[in-house]
Each structure stands twice: as C-alpha cells, then as structure tokens.
Amino acid sequence: MVAPRGRGSRPFNSRGARGGRGRGQRGGRKPRFETSRVEEVHHEASSDGESGLSEGNVDAEDEVELIDELSSGSDDDDEEDKKTSKPYNTLLQLFNAGQDTNGPARKRRKVEHSSKKTEVQIKEPEELDDEADLSESEIEDDEEDEDAEGIAVDEGEAEDSGDEDDATDPFETHFSNVDSSLLLQQINVISTKGWKTHKNELPGKFRLVLSHPDTGGDAVQLPPPAHGLQSLKLKQKLANHAGDHIAKFESLTSGLVPYIFGYQDLLFGARTLSNSAKFRDLYCLHVLNHILKTRDRVLKNNSRSQKEPDQDLELRDQGFTRPKVLIILPTRQACVRVVESITKLYHAEQQENKSRFYDTFSAADDKSWEDKPDDFRELFGGNDDDMFRLGLKFTRKTIKYFSQFYNSDIILASPLGLRMVMDKEDGKKQDFDFLSSIEVAVVDQADALLMQNWEHIEYVFSHLNLQPKESHGCDFSRVRNWYLDGQAKYVRQTLVFSSFITPEINALFSSQMHNTAGKVKVTPTYEGAILDIPLPVPVKQTFSRFNSTSPVKDPDDRFKYFTSAVLSSLVRSSTGSGGKPHASGTLIFIPSYLDFVRVRNYLATSSQTENLSFGAISEYTSVRDVARARTHFFSGRHSALLYTERTHHFRRYQIRGVKRVIMYGVPENPVFWGEIVGFLGLDPAGTAEAAEGGVRALFSKWDALKMERIVGTKRLGNMLMEKGGDTFSFV
C-alpha cells in the first residue's frame, strides 16, 4: 500500500513541484555506455552483481575516467550514437595501453585533467521510478577494478600524504578501534536507560544536557570548545578548501563542534535563519570527512590484501551496503542548499548529471511572497515539493548525482520520498536494506517535518541499521563485527536540527538516539513570545489553565473545559437580546486538526451554539471555500472563524476582521503567536477596540514545552505549579 501523506503532509500542491515526482525535463533517456563488452575483455572482473553494490568495491577512478573522457568529449548525444564503434575501439586500446604502461600512463592523464573541471551528463534511470533506486541489475558505468584500485590508492596517498592514521581521531576510536566488551557493556546500560547526565551553560543563554552510558567508569569530561578547523581531524583534501567557506567558530558553534565531529548524537533546538547555513556547512563537512575516511580505509586495505595475498589478514572496514550517510530534509530546495554546501567543500573535477539535478530540484522564488515572513520564504521558497530522494556517489574526481541507492555514499530524501521507495504500491515488496549501514543520520528542519507527516520519520528510523534481507554482493569477511552482531544502531550518529523541540522530537531523542559515545541536547532560554507583539497598543493576554491527568486524556479534558467555560461566554457575547447577532470577530485558533474537526462538528450540531454563525478554515479547505469564509468573517456574517495551525504554517493568511482571539491551544511555533495576535491590528480604525478584546489561551501542564516559548522560561514554573489560581494575565 502506498504510504499516505497523512494529516501531516503538505496538502497544497499549487506551489513548488517542478517536474512532479522529480522526473527530468530534458527529453528521453540518453544512451549509456554498456559495460558488458568490457566485462568480456576483463573476465577477471567481479561477478554476482558485486560491482557497484558492495562497499568493498570502492571506485578506482582510472577506468571510470577513461569512460568519462569519451562521454564528455562531445555534448551531442546523437553524435555519440553515430560513432559508437569508434569510441569502443578507442576504449579497448586505452585499456590495453594501460596494461602495458600501467602506472605512468594513468599518472600522465591525471596531470592533464588537473587544471579543468567538467560536467558530464549521463542520464541514469529516473530516481523516483519504482525500481530505479534499488535495482541491482543495472550496474553503473564505473565498474570497479581491483588492479585499478591499487593505483587509486597510490595516487590518493600521494595526494593526501599528510593523512596518516591517528589513534586519537574520533573516526578511529568510534568505528575502527572498538573494544567489543566495552561496547557490549555500554549497550546493556543503554537498553536499561542507564544514562548519566551532565548540565552546562553555553554562551548566549543556551542550555546543554550531555547524557552518556553510566558504566561506572571515570567521570566524563565535557570537551573544550573548538576555535577553528585546525582542531578537527579533517582529511587534507577537505581542510584545504573548508577554510575558504567556514570562518572562525562563534561562541555557540565552538561549543557544539566537538560533539558533532566527535560522533556524539546531537539534538539542537535553536535553529534560526541566522545560524542555519553555518550548521549546514558544518554537518556537510562532517559527513564528507566521514565518507572520505571510510573510502580511504577500504582502498588502503584493498591494496594491502593484494600486496599480501598469503597473509591471513583481518580487515574489518565495511558495512553491509555502501550508503553511509542519510540526510532527511523537508523540500527539494532544501536539498539544493545541502548539495551546494557539499560541492563547495568537496572540489570535484566532474559533476555528472548536475544540470539535471538543478532542472528537477531547484526553482525561482515566488515574487508575490514579498510580504511573507522570512522563515516562510526560507522553507517554501523555490521548489517546495516534499516528495523526493537523491543518491550522491563520490569518487576521487567525480560527484555523481542520481546514483542508485546501493551505489551511493550519501542519500538525501524527504520522509515521504523514502517511505514511498521502502513500501511499494502492491504492499508485497519492501526494500530498506540500503539503510542497513547508515553511520551518520541527519535530520534538518525537523520542525518543518512535523508539519508534514511525522509518522514517516518514525518509520524510517525504525528501519535504520537492520540486518539486510539479501547480501547485495557484500564481502562478509570485511564487515565490522558490530554490524554482524546487530549493534550498528548503538554506533550510528544522529544529528537533529530544529527551530524548537516538541514531544515528538523528544521521543525521537529518547527512543532512536542510542549512541554509545553519548548524546547532547541543546535548548535556548526563552524570553517569551508575549513580549514581541506587533501592535501599537497594549493587548491583554490571558492564559487559562485546566486540569488534565494524562497526555492521553488531555484532548477530552481540553474539549470539556472549552465547551463549559469558554464557549458559553462566546455564545453570550455573540448574540444579543432575542438571539439576534450582536458581536462578531472572534478567531478560534486550533493547533490540532483532530481537535478542529471535533470543535467544528460540535458548533454545527449543538443546541448550545444554534445561534452562533461560524466559518472554518483548515489545511484541507479548498481555496474557494477559504475565500468565502474569510469574506463572511470580515463582513460580520460569521461571528466566529475556526483556523488551524497547519493552515497558517502553509499559507500565512492575514485574517482581517479579528476583534478577539481564542487559542484552543498555544501554537508549537512561537512565531505564530505574534502573527495571530497581530491580526487584531490589521484594521487600524478598530485596533483599540480589538486590543480590549485581547487574547485568551487554554493550556495544561502537558503544554510545558510550548508554553515556555510563549511566556518565557522564567514565568513557566509558576504558571504550571501555581496553587492559588488557574488564570494568568499579561499586558
């Protein structure tokens, strides 16, 4: 069965998606170089689909780039078709020449290409076709050759001569030099939730909580801040370029970099427009460093095993499948920003299918959004399609877009895009083996993903690091022991960046972030959204607390309080003598769609509200019905208007005619508080009257996270624990 978008998915399709499901707009499929004839010549090539599927077959560039030279020599694909036989003969001659003059010929070719960068367009199967991402039968053009891999190692070592194995490198200590007995002890502690916590203050009024497995050993010391890239264990190829784009770390960044590059889990709940690009560059640098070190280790061990064939070497350096990094993002344009960060940090001579990527993933901003808030334009600007997935493959000189998942190093996807490929339409074929060896998982803009369908996030994480159903050409003699023992999820690093933290995100932190190296949660200290109201006159903001015994019963307790204590006064104020309409302009803001349906149905059927006229706008209301409801509300024909948080998230309407605001629950996003209350001032002539009507919000102790952002960290404690009353007013 197809994975539903659900009540959390983006319901509006009018903006964004260029190319629908991400199909290219550059015409039919281009001819691909067929490797079957080459395989006949090189009969020693690996069999059983191992090429390009196993991590052990890491690309050696020499054969690949011979093909690249032929494919990039002409921009006209038709001309390439007409001259098929000639390039093939040339290719064989080059292969034979490479065998006769093995090292020198390839070295010369490397020098010739070092001064130029090329984009190669090789049309791969569509990344959203049913089978394209996961097919093992379609091996890519870059078949790996073990002899060529040996040369790639030699050249790579010359290229990165300063990169030596460092026992203090977190990559070594966390993935390679693992004490199996200590790992098992830590896993047992984590399984029983035996976390020991340390609290710390970061510059800028940020709170940090570090949790690590309490194994009874020495006390864990908080790492010192990192003040520059020189303190990080970076591959030399990255360090040479990163300094051009990542300046000296600021106070907050310097405190978090040691955890990110130390392979500890991180939940960062203070993502903003000003720091989002900095953290994006940092985690892109981190995952690139991880990919390059993983590839370098495999290549060196390949070379070692070839040079010492008689030795019984224990070379444990791989996972079950090649993909090592998963980056989950809300939109295609967000994916473009991440890819741009990657490409500016990793200087590749060639980028295959780059134009196709930008054609299908990027779009111009809507010029009519000049009056929209900055956070809205950042999230929905450009291509806001939330159905996508993309594989990136890295070789020594090339970045390859739209690589098949089992051939990819990094997978970038939306939750829905991943869910669609994991669960096929017929419900019979499931494939998530490509997630079995993920070692770094990144979730960016988690707050935006909450407004899609968070169930897809939970589903994806529940399928990370499972034992694969098929071998996919894996060399099990090279697989790390903690993969074979099913312990990979305790080694995986997870990084989550969000503008704020919700119970759902906290649940992800508790249930899916099991890193034996520890995990860190960072939250800001809030002053309160009630202090930042965009009105020229003071507005009375009242908070009414109701009792709720458990989160499960909270919806029922909230509804009961609303109908008994709030709705009765609303009905009285909205009707005059004889039941005639008297007052209008009440906006009822409802965060949850399920609560919206419940309240709407009650207002439509209850005898208590038979004289109350109202309109309703939700994320599923048609554009025509939205316009009608807004018109009737502004004219006074409707006394009340129901309005959901997700509607405001996706549309940011400016509702006119509001004279009073009732919050059925406070919004998750604190920015929405000021915007909703700001509706009271959209009609200047009635601003003073609207200010008198003010705002009334309902809350319970289970709304603590939301309330902290609205009223401020210092005020929250008294409001939750106050015994003398349940009503709190601020002006």
Curated annotation (Swiss-Prot):
| One Gene Ontology cellular component annotation held by this UniProt entry | small-subunit processome
Q: Where is the composition biased (Basic and acidic residues)?
A: 31-46, 112-125
Question: Which GO BP annotation is one of this protein's?
Answer: maturation of SSU-rRNA from tricistronic rRNA transcript (SSU-rRNA, 5.8S rRNA, LSU-rRNA)
How it assembles, according to the record, is: Component of the ribosomal small subunit (SSU) processome composed of at least 40 protein subunits and snoRNA U3.
Q: Give the similarity note.
A: Belongs to the UTP25 family.
Record carries keyword Cytoplasm: no
The annotated regions of Polar residues compositional bias extend over 86-102
Q: Which InterPro entries match?
A: P-loop_NTPase, UTP25, UTP25_C, UTP25_NTPase-like
Task: Report the superkingdom from the record.
Answer: Eukaryota
Provide this UniProt record's keywords sorted from A to Z. Answer: Nucleus, Ribonucleoprotein, Ribosome biogenesis, rRNA processing
Provide the primary localization: nucleus
List every stretch annotated Disordered. Answer: 1-174
Q: Which GO terms describe its molecular function?
A: rRNA binding; U3 snoRNA binding
Under Pfam families, the record lists:
Utp25_C, UTP25_NTPase-like
Q: What does this protein do?
A: DEAD-box RNA helicase-like protein required for pre-18S rRNA processing, specifically at sites A0, A1, and A2.
Compositionally biased intervals (Basic residues)? 18-30
Q: Tell me where in or outside the cell this protein is found.
A: Nucleus, Nucleolus
Identify this protein by name.
U3 small nucleolar RNA-associated protein 25
Q: Where is the composition biased (Acidic residues)?
A: 58-80, 126-169
